[in-house]
A protein has these predicted regions:
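NAD(P)-dependent short-chain dehydrogenase/reductase
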Residues: 1-43, 50
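Hydrophobic/aromatic beta-strand patches that form the interior of the parallel beta-sheet core
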Residues: 3-5, 67, 96, 127
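Amphipathic alpha-helical segments that line or abut small-molecule/effector binding pockets
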Residues: 49-57, 134
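Mid/C-terminal beta-alpha module of Rossmann-like enzyme folds, strongest
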Residues: 54, 61-107
Length: 140
């Protein structure tokens, strides 16, 4: 008997051991490095602070089920990078476009449509990516 919790594309303001996708995008843009972002793929970014609150609830209210603790919306990596640039006043012209097919060429394939939803999560309102970025701005 166990709880299985699935998360998707976690991101946060600080974690020095490993950069997540948000901090990687932000770092590239801050250092004026161009990025080629996928336009025809979807991801579900999840703010780690929300995951922590959701896990606390699940630990205190055990039920042997599968839960998805994921962000409130999904978007393309291109749109995610555009939002990072917008929220942190970085240069959007550094963000180029590519397709999923072109990006995974000669690489290990990634899921093209990672559109996971929190159907059973009626205990904690997960943030959208834009709301998560607003909170990160306050934390930085």
């Amino acid at each position: 008997q166990a709880i299985i919790v699935r998360i998707s594309y976690p991101y946060r303001a600080h974690f020095e051991l490993k950069k997540d996708f948000f901090r990687t995008f932000k770092s590239y843009l801050e250092n004026k490095k161009p990025l080629s972002m996928i336009t025809d793929s979807l991801m579900t970014p999840t703010f780690i602070d929300d995951i922590a609150f959701g896990l606390k609830y699940l630990f205190n209210n055990f039920s042997p089920e599968i839960f998805h603790l994921v962000g409130a919306n999904f978007l393309s990596p291109y749109n995610a990078c555009q939002l990072v640039a917008e929220k942190f006043n970085l240069d959007k012209s550094l963000i180029g476009k590519t397709t999923y097919k072109e990006y995974v060429k000669n690489k290990a394939k990634l899921p093209q449509f990672a559109t996971i939803k929190s159907k059973k999560n009626n205990f904690y309102k997960m943030r959208t990516f834009e709301q998560g970025l607003e909170e990160i701005k306050k934390q930085l």
